[in-house]
C-alpha cells in the first residue's frame, strides 16, 4: 500500500492511552511511558494509529504522532457511514462495526470512538468483543476499517457492473 502524503491533510490528534511501564533493575525500578495516538482527517477520510515509547510523556506522544502519520489509511465512507458490516481483529481484541442510518451517531466505546470519529465516520454501530485493552481495540478497529470495500471496488474485483451486485 502506498504511503499517504500527510502534509496535504488537516490532521487532528487524539491520545487514546498512556501506559506507565516499569523495568525492575538492581537499583530499583525504571519507569517509561507507552502512548497510543490516533491521527485523522475527518473531512477526507484518513486515519492512522501510532505508538510511542519514551522516558517522558511528551516525547512518547511526539513519537506516537510521527508513527501514526506513517501509517495512515483511507477509509471508504458511504454518505456518513461505512459500506458494510465488518469484524476487525487484533490480538485478543475484536471489534464489530455495523453501518447505521443517518442521525444515529457514533455508538462506540472510548478507543473505538476515537478512531471512527478521526476517520470522519458520523453514523456507525460498534461492539467490542474479547480484550478491552485500549491499544488492542484501536488496532482491531483499524484492521476492520482496512477490510472495508465499496460496491464499486467489489464489482471491479469480480469484473461485473455495479448494478449486477444487487440483483
UniProtKB/Swiss-Prot annotation:
Family matches, as Pfam families: Ribosomal_S5, Ribosomal_S5_C
Any one cellular-component term (Gene Ontology): small ribosomal subunit
GO biological process, one term: translation
Start and end residues of each S5 DRBM domain: 11-75
Keyword RNA-binding: yes
InterPro entries attached to this UniProt entry: Ribosomal_Su5_D2-typ_SF, Ribosomal_uS5, Ribosomal_uS5_bac-type, Ribosomal_uS5_C, Ribosomal_uS5_N, Ribosomal_uS5_N_CS, Ribsml_uS5_D2-typ_fold_subgr
Family matches, as PROSITE patterns: RIBOSOMAL_S5, S5_DSRBD
Gene Ontology molecular function: rRNA binding; structural constituent of ribosome
Keywords: Ribonucleoprotein, Ribosomal protein, RNA-binding, rRNA-binding
UniProt keyword Ribonucleoprotein present: yes
Free-text note regarding domains: The N-terminal domain interacts with the head of the 30S subunit; the C-terminal domain interacts with the body and contacts protein S4. The interaction surface between S4 and S5 is involved in control of translational fidelity.
Record's subunit section: Part of the 30S ribosomal subunit. Contacts proteins S4 and S8.
Family: Belongs to the universal ribosomal protein uS5 family.
Job of this protein: With S4 and S12 plays an important role in translational accuracy. Located at the back of the 30S subunit body where it stabilizes the conformation of the head with respect to the body.
NCBIfam families named among the record's database cross-references: rpsE_bact
Descriptive protein name: Small ribosomal subunit protein uS5
Organism this protein belongs to: Caldanaerobacter subterraneus subsp. tengcongensis (strain DSM 15242 / JCM 11007 / NBRC 100824 / MB4)
This protein's encoding gene: rpsE
